[in-house]
């Protein structure tokens, strides 16, 4: 399934001339319940991602959750991802930075946009400037998230690309009786709003049949939905880029 999904995503992005990085998790270490599906584990998971790179010919990224994973992951992945819940973990950020690989740091739901600067410093302190920041919503009371699009220009001021995670941003954390729920119907609205706000890329969870996904199904989009979003996003992106010189700076 991983190879087939990667190939279909590659083909969609190729048709639209949109750069694409394939993300899959070898371990979903932050699931709500002990009974929740976590993935194949680091050894088998990295083997699968290595196959995706070799056979589908795309770059790959995955989460690292502990410094013990960084070395092995860095030998396979083209980019390392720091999960939102771990974005303040100094040792993990330092270890990821020392690999020299690009590092995508997801902003925690509990973190203000301006407070991502220390996370950047922990990586640049390892002489690694290859950083991406990802906005994925902020806690809004219990079991809910809200997306403040001001976060995008705030985090862009430091000169690093900012990505918007449109699918995790519609998640309803732990609201599904032992799992997270979600409101996938709002993914297009948030994705297109983020592009209009100036984000440099979109993070989107995609599954052929979201209702059958073993993780995050309630906030996923299917392939047809993805293509619709990307087509619209590309048109908005063109407008935003054409008027970028007129955009006020913070």
Residue ranges and their predicted role:
Residues 8-16, 37-61, 96-102, 152-164, ...:
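Alpha-helix-loop-beta-strand connector modules within alpha/beta enzyme cores
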Residues 1-2, 20-42, 207-217:
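Glycine-rich, proline-tolerant flexible connector loops at the mouths of alpha/beta enzymes
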């Amino acid at each position: 399934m991983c190879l087939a999904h990667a190939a279909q995503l590659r083909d969609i992005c190729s048709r639209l001339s949109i750069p694409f990085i394939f993300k899959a998790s070898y371990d979903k270490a932050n699931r709500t319940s002990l009974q929740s599906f976590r993935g194949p584990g680091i050894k088998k998971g990295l083997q699968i991602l290595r196959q995706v790179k070799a056979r589908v010919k795309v770059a790959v990224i995955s989460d690292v959750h502990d410094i013990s994973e960084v070395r092995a992951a860095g030998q396979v992945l083209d980019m390392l991802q720091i999960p939102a819940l771990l974005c303040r973990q100094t040792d993990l950020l330092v270890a990821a930075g020392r690999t020299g690989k690009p590092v995508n740091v997801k902003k925690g739901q509990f973190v203000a946009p301006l407070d991502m600067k220390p996370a950047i410093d922990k990586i640049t302190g390892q002489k690694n400037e290859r950083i991406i920041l990802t906005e994925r919503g902020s806690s809004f009371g219990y079991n809910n998230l809200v997306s403040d699009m001001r976060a995008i220009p705030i985090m862009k001021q430091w000169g690093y690309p900012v990505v918007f995670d449109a699918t995790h941003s519609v998640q309803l954390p732990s609201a599904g009786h032992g799992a997270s729920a979600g409101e996938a119907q709002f993914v297009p609205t948030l994705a297109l709003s983020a592009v209009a706000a100036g984000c440099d890329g979109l993070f989107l969870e995609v599954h052929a049949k979201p209702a059958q996904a073993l993780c995050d199904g309630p906030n996923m989009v299917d392939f047809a939905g993805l293509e619709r979003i990307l087509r619209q996003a590309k048109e908005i992106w063109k407008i935003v880029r054409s008027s970028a010189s007129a955009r006020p700076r913070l």
